[in-house]
Regions:
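Short, structured coil segments at secondary-structure junctions
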Residues: 110, 179-180, 265
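N-terminal export leaders
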Residues: 3-7
Length: 314
């Protein structure tokens, strides 16, 4: 069976890097801002952006807030709603805590925008990030639950990019904001599929004034996937898992993006009937016996070492 349903037909405007869409169904102008157009997105639903005259962009992330990106040298905007956080470019001293974002910054050639990391050098799976930290171009400033506030302030941090884990420690977010550091909680993990997650590249393109590069990189990645989706499904079954310290098996729920990538690549995710209690739950824990009964005949076993570490046998 063809898997074209994973790949929407991109509108012609998007294929020609039309970051400035033609949709003129305008929301009400905000204070002195004059609405121009809504930024076109093809897959992502967990953020939106409205573009205003003068290069101002309002980013809206559900349950995470609204952010007005102000171009370098542009005038301040009067009478903004209280919930809007102003991000003035250049955003070149970023404290990056959300590890999934690092690869997107690499693709935007924007590592020099990151001054601080929430992960130590040895913890990075992105080689460019590890090297930058080893060379002292990016400094460690503590994990999401225990940031080094002194170092963050000394570095002149312009933005902290967190994932939703910080919501379990709301006092951290509050303290950063109290010190004048704006906090953006990214929600790419709540997207419905891999291409939607990847489209967050465009959000960082907006923040870093690299929208054309972000759109071009995204277009190229979509094209790379397109021919794969045209191929017939191989029928090979795949189990993707890790083992916790208390000997439980962690697997991805059926609708998770990893399971979707298996299907996009032509495989069959073996746990095709597992869903979490909430839509935000991406993993499910199984007893060893249950996992073995389902996975023993799988054609491919993929062990996820990024969470629990590399598995050792004795």
């Amino acid at each position: 069976m063809k898997r074209r349903n994973f790949l929407k037909a991109l509108p012609a405007a998007a294929l020609t890097l039309a970051g400035c869409g033609q949709n003129k169904t305008a929301p009400a102008n905000t204070a002195s801002l004059v609405f121009d157009h809504s930024y076109p997105l093809d897959y992502a639903t967990q953020f939106s952006a409205d573009c205003y005259e003068g290069g101002y962009v309002m980013i809206d992330i559900p349950d995470a807030g609204r952010f007005l990106v102000v171009p370098e040298g542009a005038a301040e905007v009067d009478d903004l709603p209280e919930d809007v956080v102003v991000l003035r470019q250049p955003l070149d001293h970023i404290y990056l805590v959300s590890t999934s974002v690092m690869d997107l910054f690499v693709h935007l050639d924007a590592l020099d925008s990151i001054a601080l990391s929430g992960t130590k050098a040895e913890g990075w799976y992105v080689e460019e990030a590890r090297q930058a930290m080893q060379e002292g171009r990016i400094a460690y400033a503590g994990k999401y639950s225990a940031p080094d506030y002194e170092r963050i302030l000394a570095a002149g941090c312009t933005l902290a990019i967190e994932n939703t884990m910080v919501l379990h420690d709301p006092e951290v977010k509050e303290q950063l904001e109290k010190f004048g550091v704006p906090v953006l909680v990214e929600r790419s993990s709540y997207e419905s599929g891999p291409l939607a997650r990847m489209e967050w590249l465009k959000l960082y393109g907006i923040l870093l004034n690299k929208t054309e590069m972000a759109e071009e990189v995204f277009r190229q990645k979509v094209e790379q996937v397109a021919h794969i989706l045209e191929q017939e499904n191989t029928g090979k079954t795949v189990a993707f898992f890790s083992i916790t310290t208390n000997n439980l098996i962690t697997v991805r729920r059926t609708s998770d993006y990893v399971a979707q990538m298996v299907e996009m690549a032509g495989g069959v995710y073996i746990f095709d009937d597992l869903e979490g209690e909430t839509s935000a739950q991406s993993t499910i824990k199984l007893p060893l016996e249950t996992f073995y009964a389902r996975a023993r005949d799988a054609d491919v076993l993929i062990y996820n070492s990024t969470i629990e570490g590399v598995m050792e046998t004795r």
